[in-house]
Amino acid sequence: MDYISIIIQGVIQGLTEFLPVSSSGHLSVAQHFMNIGENTLITSVVLHLGTLLAVFIAFFPTIWGMIKEFFLTIKDIFTGKFSWKNMNANRRMMFMVIISTAMLVPVYFFKDFFTGFEGDNDIIFEGFAFIFTAILLFMSDKCIKGNKTGDKMKVADAVAIGAMQCVALFPGVSRSGSTTAAGLFCGLTKETAVTFSFILGIPAILGGSVLEIGDALKSNVELDWVQLGIGFVVSAAVGLLAIALVKWLLKKDRFKIFGFYTAILGLACIGIGAYELATGLTLRFCFLTEFKYNSMTLGERT
């Protein structure tokens, strides 16, 4: 991996973590073409932490409000003042995030099953997952607009969104896209659905990183901390720009374009993957691999 590769991966992670197009799927496809191997895990963790920082910066007032409500809730429980029915938006959203996140706990025991699709030698599965994401986006665009805000969310809403987040562990299924779609299906307003989706990503990203970073550091792969630092900064900076873009697209009601994008990308991945399986060749971008593939081919011919 070189500096160009880590910058490209940082840009991809920063954009696709928040745009409803699947960051894991894009990184899996990019790593497939760039022929990145053993250091993929630690790189993925660092890039995800970069986007985590972007969420904290972009939604700090709401996140801080939820943190305060967490401690106030504990106080109310011990003083007998807690009421499930009478909660403000931050407190109710805090509980809904906890419920949705709790659904990931048993699923993470099977994390190797999900990550195995990123480490295989083809991108056909990612292609079908991209198409699944496109279907969700098209369906959510056609559903009746809801009027339910954060203070009106129910446990059933959190369960439905949490279940969709579990499905999004597959590379190619957009976490933000699928959870936003689930929120819209539950009758949430677009702003509430998107805000909840982004904040819900915090414990998911943080928990996944904590579980994976131990395994990554135990590996014998030599790490370039300068490159990883660059990737972290790039993913955080691009992530902030992506969040601003999503907010703008939300106002303009243009999420449908991501459905077309993921559908086309999915078909392309399936086509390329099928070609690679049929021919035994792997298509890679030579300028990203320092022309190693062409040099090897030329050497064999001479």
Residue ranges and their predicted role:
Residues 1-302:
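Multi-pass membrane proteins that catalyze or facilitate reactions on polyprenyl-/lipid-phosphate substrates
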